[in-house]
From Swiss-Prot:
Annotated catalysed reactions: uridine + ATP = UMP + ADP + H(+); cytidine + ATP = CMP + ADP + H(+)
Domain of life from the UniProt record: Bacteria
Protein's organism: Clostridium perfringens (strain 13 / Type A)
HAMAP family (alphabetical): Uridine_kinase
PANTHER family in UniProt: URIDINE KINASE (PTHR10285)
Entry's transmembrane regions: none
InterPro entries: P-loop_NTPase (IPR027417), PRK/URK (IPR006083), Uridine_kinase (IPR026008), Uridine_kinase-like (IPR000764)
Keywords annotated in UniProt: ATP-binding, Cytoplasm, Kinase, Nucleotide-binding, Transferase
Residues reported to bind ATP: 11-18
UniProt xrefs under NCBIfam families: PRK05480.1, udk
Molecular-function annotations in GO: ATP binding; cytidine kinase activity; uridine kinase activity
GO cellular component: cytoplasm
An example Gene Ontology biological process: UMP salvage
Name of this chain's protein: Uridine kinase
Length: 208
């Protein structure tokens, strides 16, 4: 198998990262793409009580097991399959279930802090930052966390103001400078997606 290309998609919470990833997935097909979500690599917290898990700052780089993520990306780069961990947000902990991910022609790595770690940046062939207005992002996060993660509106708002927003400004926003492509206004920018698809095809051609 020829060397896979690694595409990093980052941006603030609710910016439209998943929308971009899904559109690339749609254009190239499941046979060509492996998906790696940084959210799957939150650290195991089995040693903590639920009360302490809830206090974890999930928007800080220390919340992620980047050593495992880097190891898995290197395995995919070398043509080996991995067992991607699973994280249950309702219990704030990793669970035993894993997902087997085979090496593919294109590996998409998606998450709020993937460009913060230089080891991950080094592995990425194309680095994308999805730049979306903060008001839009908080609304999207509220809808997601209430509907999918069993959160209350009050808890989501408090977390956004006290953790998410300051962490975004301190850690996520500054990584924009590392991006090759910056997409304004979220994941519904067709021109930007067309440019990304063309760039992916160009890079794929180099590895033929």
């Amino acid at each position: 198998m020829k060397r896979p290309i690694f595409i990093g998609i980052t941006g603030g919470t609710g910016s439209g990262k998943s929308t971009i990833a899904k559109e690339i997935y749609r254009q190239f097909g499941e046979d060509c793409i492996a998906m790696i979500e940084q959210d799957s690599y939150y650290k195991d917290q089995s040693h903590l009580s639920m009360e302490d898990r809830v206090k974890t700052n999930y928007d800080h780089p220390n919340a992620f097991d980047n050593n495992l993520l880097v190891s898995h990306l290197e395995s995919l780069l070398n043509g080996h399959s991995i067992q991607k961990p699973s994280y249950d947000f309702s219990i704030h902990n990793r669970i035993e279930d894993t997902t087997k991910v085979e090496p593919k022609e294109i590996v998409i790595v998606e998450g709020i802090l993937i460009l913060e770690d230089p080891r991950i940046r080094e592995l990425l062939d194309i680095k994308i930052y999805v730049d979306t207005d903060a008001d839009v992002r908080i609304i999207r996060r509220m809808v997601r966390d209430i509907n999918e993660r069993g959160r209350t509106m009050e808890s989501v708002i408090n977390q956004y103001l006290n953790v998410v927003k300051p962490m975004h400004n301190q850690f996520t926003e500054p990584t924009k400078k590392f991006a090759d492509i910056i997409i304004p206004e979220g994941g519904h920018n067709k021109v930007a997606i067309d440019i990304i698809v063309a760039k992916i095809k160009e890079v794929l051609g180099k590895y033929e």
